[in-house]
């Protein structure tokens, strides 16, 4: 497994360095790395994010072995993030963490990658692949860099991501209930109760489990969920609604 990862990293590095040569035009002047970097910073400060990205990219292509190149890669990713080019930012950051796993700003690279997916989170009615990527990325930041300044914000955002993922399950579960398919609905609500029990959707998920089980005639099962709802959320509105269901 380690050999496979190492081989993959070598391939990434080789492709990245090979592309440096292909990106350079025959008649393109090689500009000093520091000059390109300063130009990128100037464009960034002026709000010209795509132009800034292009300048930082030149550092990588023209000076792949320069000491400032890793920082230019990060700044290129940041410029793309600000420009709303999140997929491109993620691609740059994926290469960065392969090339520079021990860089002093490696925590920021993982954090910015997670943010690039986080900002693409869509409505619960739509595909949630970016939400799942954000979830994985934020968890990785917390796991790898628990003492970093990014871990705190990652934890806060992770709560919101989990709430969003729970919302997706609730949306699908309610749909199944509306179609009189309580068996399929139960599977969705159980995911919320078991995997997202700290989110704001947990009380309603328990209520919907009561409702779904009653539709199936499983009164004892419904009462079990009612007990959990009453114990965990005694003052919640969904607990009060459940009382009416079981009368």
Region roles according to the model:
Residues 9-16:
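Bacterial N-terminal signal peptides
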């Amino acid at each position: 497994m380690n050999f496979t990862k190492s081989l993959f990293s070598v391939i990434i590095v080789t492709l990245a360095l090979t592309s440096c040569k292909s990106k350079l035009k025959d008649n393109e002047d090689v500009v000093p790395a520091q000059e390109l970097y300063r130009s990128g910073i100037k464009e960034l400060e002026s709000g010209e994010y795509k132009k800034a990205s292009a300048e930082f990219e030149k550092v990588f292509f023209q000076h792949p072995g320069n000491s400032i190149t890793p920082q230019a890669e990060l700044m290129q990713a940041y410029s793309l993030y600000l420009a709303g080019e999140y997929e491109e930012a993620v691609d740059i950051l994926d290469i960065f963490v392969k090339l520079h796993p021990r860089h002093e700003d490696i925590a920021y690279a993982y954090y910015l990658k997670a943010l690039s997916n986080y900002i693409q989170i869509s409505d619960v009615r739509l595909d949630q692949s970016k939400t799942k990527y954000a979830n994985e990325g934020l968890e990785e930041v917390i796991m790898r860099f628990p003492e970093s300044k990014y871990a705190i914000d990652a934890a806060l955002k992770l709560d919101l991501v989990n709430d969003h993922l729970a919302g997706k399950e609730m949306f699908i579960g309610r749909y199944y209930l509306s179609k009189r398919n309580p068996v399929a609905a139960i599977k969705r609500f159980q995911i919320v109760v078991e995997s997202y029990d700290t989110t704001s959707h947990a009380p309603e998920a328990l209520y919907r489990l009561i409702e779904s089980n009653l539709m199936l005639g499983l009164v004892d099962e419904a009462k079990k969920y009612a007990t959990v709802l009453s114990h965990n959320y005694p003052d919640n509105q969904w607990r009060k609604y459940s009382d009416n269901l079981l009368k």
